[in-house]
């Protein structure tokens, strides 16, 4: 009678490895969250530090730019630094224009990467395109690495686009230019993938993407792409933008496609504000998947929006404090307290919905609204266990949450 998201589209499973870490994209694997650094890759230490930050935030793959000989030479050192820090997240090399040369001239780089990203629109021009694309695929075969063949609206193969525009002009009923562009993106991606298969790369070594910047454009392209191939698909807008605009655009496009069962890995291409951590894109990606019920990454905090009954800012401050605390604890809790990522915490601002929402959560607190008794009942697994008062409500509630996690999700508890 009632339905949620559509069944997941069937795709080839692509294994991405480093050491003992295996991240599978597609097949029956969960939708993966990945990210990209914005450091100068030639700065091996700075890049390794940012990769570690992204991995600690929960990024399952991290892409790094490999654009110069200096960057390619630094990749093995980045990998070595990460391994020394105990960070085994697979690295994806992002190649444009000269990837065939860098993979040939820097074999240690080719080996240290776990996956290559190839852009068929700029791998070469004219007659050189096919041979240079082939060189990159041959490197992937030689080093047993999967690839993402990533087509971008802004760097589409111009020869292909010109040919398709000419063919469209000869039609009795020409398509709109936008539709020709969509078709060019799809043909470039699928045609390049099929060429890679002809060269000897397995279908289980190929991920496809067709990135654009518009929400409706992305949805239209991926609906058709998913219908016409069985390759694993990487979702993301090319440039989502800054702040709320970028978050909303990414959520609208990616959320809609995931709801239709389309997509095997996602990357949120947010423009970070000056000084803001790069990890924001990882958190947004995780929250899209968790909010949609597709995966669980960290405990969720439910909080009311506030109204005239909640003139105090205490519930807002407490909700932010608890949400930040939970996120900060996850790098440790993820291994120490398996299952904690599914926990729900409610921080409510008044008596109207406070007790009810708190009872539905694993742990909840209903703070007093304007004119209400200055007391905050706490609920654990649906039962009222305590009433907090005074100036230390935040500290006491945080301790209750911490104690609940240790008691409920500790390994000894999980084994009993």
Curated annotation (Swiss-Prot):
Pathway participation: Isoprenoid biosynthesis; isopentenyl diphosphate biosynthesis via DXP pathway; isopentenyl diphosphate from 1-deoxy-D-xylulose 5-phosphate: step 5/6
Its EC number(s): 1.17.7.3
Co-factor remark: Binds 1 [4Fe-4S] cluster.
Enzyme class: oxidoreductase
Superkingdom assignment: Bacteria
Function summary: Converts 2C-methyl-D-erythritol 2,4-cyclodiphosphate (ME-2,4cPP) into 1-hydroxy-2-methyl-2-(E)-butenyl 4-diphosphate.
Family label: Belongs to the IspG family.
Name of the protein in question: 4-hydroxy-3-methylbut-2-en-1-yl diphosphate synthase (flavodoxin)
Primary gene name: ispG
